[in-house]
């Protein structure tokens, strides 16, 4: 896992860590898309309340999504709040969203990665 460096440490509302799958997804993106995703995550982590950038997923228990639109492409990173560390959000993995709803397989994958995270703590 790796952490994202946030702009103003004293204003951080929560910290974000990336599981390996999320890191690999980001690493494989074009640099400008990756930069925009990090920028949007930092804005939300520093206190911006914007459901266009970070919102609870519909119909999924306790999963959230970081949302970025860049160059006409919808990028998503699914995440959850760590139950012990109340100010920690864990990004499980990312994908390019092609449909209105989040595909069920992505929800299942995020839930499996969340389980793996807690088992390794």
Regions found by a protein language model. Name each.
Residues 92:
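Conserved catalytic cores of phosphodiester-cleaving nucleases, focusing on short active-site segments
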